[in-house]
């Protein structure tokens, strides 16, 4: 299984690099080529990092300590090396550093569990169906920013929207970590004790209700203060957009639970993929209607509507 997963990831990484280098030829991106090349290292690094292997073996202590160490290194570099707006390449490097260190350490340590063999076999097809959902989800998650930039042609508008998205993602990442911890155990228990698996699902749902809604409401009420604290006064114009995205946090978190911890584990991959497709189509249609009129606010509202459609 591990060799199959690594083989698939290497194939998809190769395809990603082909598309990436084709994108570098676009004249509009000429000024960002060096920056894009730097960030492109994360494609191969995330592949050889085999983070999924450590989730399977529930090595959460190792994941936490490793992530903490490299994040500290990244933050120290950020505050000591980045002095002005002209240091954006150094800033990008500090973001990549944590990924480089974590993934290289993962790959070296993975030999403790498995011996990887690159191979292309008929068994790979078994994994393609559930992985298609992940691909669709990744495309869906960047659709709003891509369309906002394409329709408005305003980098400032996209930057403001990205700041709001980044702050909102802090909340969703909390629950993503929760799913990463519980999901392997639920999948394991489904084959041995279905009642225990359902109890874990019930616990997850209760934790979402306990933390998700209060956190989103609190951030909704304090959006202006949070933006001023973490992004600066220049970003206060995105306050209403961020408040809309807090509504999206509530809906998206429940969707993620339903899809990743219920549909996928119960082998309802088709339902998961269908939901993402419906959300993507809804998002594209509404973005086309709202972004020309409302800009970033329209993109945020369309994202909420798309999550509700899912």
Task: Please identify what each model-predicted range represents.
Residues 29, 56-57, 84-85, 151-155, ...:
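Helix-loop interface residues and adjacent transmembrane-helix termini in multi-pass membrane transporters
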Residues 8-136, 142:
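Hydrophobic transmembrane helix module of multi-pass membrane transport proteins
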Residues 3, 33, 61, 88-89, ...:
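Residues that define the loop-to-transmembrane-helix transition and helix capping
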Residues 24-39, 155, 219-254:
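Interfacial segments at transmembrane-helix termini and the short loops linking adjacent helices
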Residues 70, 88-106, 110, 118-188, ...:
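Transmembrane helical elements of multi-pass membrane transporters/channels
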Residues 17-25, 75-80, 103-111, 146, ...:
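Membrane-embedded alpha-helical segments of multi-pass transporters/permeases
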Residues 38-55, 66-74, 91-107, 133, ...:
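Short runs within selected transmembrane alpha-helices of multi-pass transporters and secretion channels
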Residues 1-7, 168-212, 259-265:
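Helix-loop junctions and terminal segments of transmembrane helices
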């Amino acid at each position: 299984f591990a060799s199959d997963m690594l083989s698939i990831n290497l194939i998809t990484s190769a395809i990603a690099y082909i598309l990436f280098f084709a994108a570098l030829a676009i004249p509009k991106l000429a000024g960002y080529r060096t920056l894009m090349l730097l960030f492109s290292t994360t494609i191969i690094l995330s592949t050889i990092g085999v983070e999924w292997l450590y989730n399977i073996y529930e090595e959460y202590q190792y994941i936490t300590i490793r992530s903490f160490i490299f994040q500290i290194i990244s933050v120290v570099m950020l505050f000591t090396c980045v002095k002005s707006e002209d240091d954006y390449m150094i800033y990008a490097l500090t973001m990549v550093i944590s990924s480089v260190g974590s993934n290289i350490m993962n790959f070296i340590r993975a030999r403790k569990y498995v011996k990887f063999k690159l191979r292309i076999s008929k068994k790979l097809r078994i994994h393609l169906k559930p992985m298609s959902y992940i691909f669709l989800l990744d495309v869906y998650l960047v659709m709003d920013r891509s369309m906002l930039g394409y329709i408005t042609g305003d980098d400032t508008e996209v930057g403001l929207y990205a700041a709001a998205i980044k702050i909102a993602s802090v909340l969703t990442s909390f629950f993503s970590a929760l799913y990463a911890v519980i999901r392997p155990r639920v999948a394991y228990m489904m084959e041995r004790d279905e009642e225990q698996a359902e109890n874990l699902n019930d616990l997850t749902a209760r934790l979402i209700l306990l933390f998700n809604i209060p956190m989103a409401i609190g951030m909704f009420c304090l959006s202006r203060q949070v933006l001023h604290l973490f992004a600066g006064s220049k970003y206060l114009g995105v306050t209403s957009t961020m408040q809309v995205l807090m509504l999206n946090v509530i809906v998206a978190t429940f969707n993620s639970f339903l899809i990743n911890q219920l549909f996928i584990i119960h082998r309802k991959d088709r339902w998961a993929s269908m939901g993402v497709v419906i959300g993507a189509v809804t998002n594209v249609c509404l973005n086309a209607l709202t972004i020309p009129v409302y800009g970033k606010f329209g993109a945020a509202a369309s994202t909420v509507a798309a999550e509700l459609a899912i």
